[in-house]
């Protein structure tokens, strides 16, 4: 009898989706602040609807930042250059409502900049998760990797002119058939591929389907995962001309599963974009990913999740938890001990060890196509840390 398999699905949206537009604007503001002032305290939200983008939040920085220019440049770089495609970067309304960080939070977290890095408290309470699995070279879930890469490829063939009919907004979804091998996930095949992409008025549905198969799906999904039973839903609604902020309102922090593990593992609920590294929603999730990835890369387990939790103003995490889903070479309590001995979970030290105070175009890169499983020197949390432990006991 064949081993029992199951289906699991992950989705993604590309950079022209209104929620992702907002994530990118928020992280572009963060980048601009950190580039001039590494100690900037940033909590920047963005919302958008037809012909309007608003940035708002709390920012304390010595940087001189032209918020309107950042908004327009970000929208233009995505491809929002006319009302036809969903937004005109040069003509839309830009609203700005930025205040300083609350002094109550400032004194509790960093003592108005008087605390040493190791004494800096968490910027808020919260729970964060890191996840890793040996099913792909990225040590990420295959369903999430494929959905994300399809979205990135859609943008690539739009911007390089391969598919000139494409417009910025688009969504992807991939269903993978898996085998559970003692707690480890083994992908068997791709069951379903769904792509809904914004397009211009000139193209037919048949042309859309043919181009998506040839120029998007074929280069992204390895042939070994596709067979005659694989189902393709390519623009199943039949028409997607109106998109971007014209089609839907957008808001920072609305795509947190796409940003992380595509529904695998767990999520503490806190979004990443627009937050400086004292916000443990972001830095805590990054160090938890590095810990989980390092556990898998070191051979201690085939799949694992790490949870950490914080209290506002307190440097040390309240709890650290590890679960290897039964795939651990040693008991989970031993893996937990190794994690605690090898990783410093204090927010001020995470910032230093992962070099999270560097801006430029560092964080805007994270704001589309996932924060994890990416090969880029700026994604310092993706660097596997060699774990020091007694090899004999493992």
Swiss-Prot record:
It catalyses: L-methionine + ATP + H2O = S-adenosyl-L-methionine + phosphate + diphosphate. Its cofactor is Mn(2+); Mg(2+); Co(2+); K(+). InterPro entries: ADOMET_SYNTHASE_CS, S-AdoMet_synt_C, S-AdoMet_synt_central, S-AdoMet_synt_N, S-AdoMet_synthetase, S-AdoMet_synthetase_sfam. Keywords: ATP-binding, Cobalt, Cytoplasm, Magnesium, Metal-binding, Nucleotide-binding, One-carbon metabolism, Potassium, Transferase. It holds the Pfam family S-AdoMet_synt_M. GO terms for molecular function: ATP binding; metal ion binding; methionine adenosyltransferase activity. Induction: During compatible and incompatible interactions with Blumeria graminis f. sp. tritici, especially in the infected epidermis. Induced by abiotic stresses such as wounding, cold, drought, and salt. Its EC number is 2.5.1.6. It is found in: Cytoplasm. One of its GO terms (biological process) is S-adenosylmethionine biosynthetic process. Homotetramer. This is S-adenosylmethionine synthase 1.
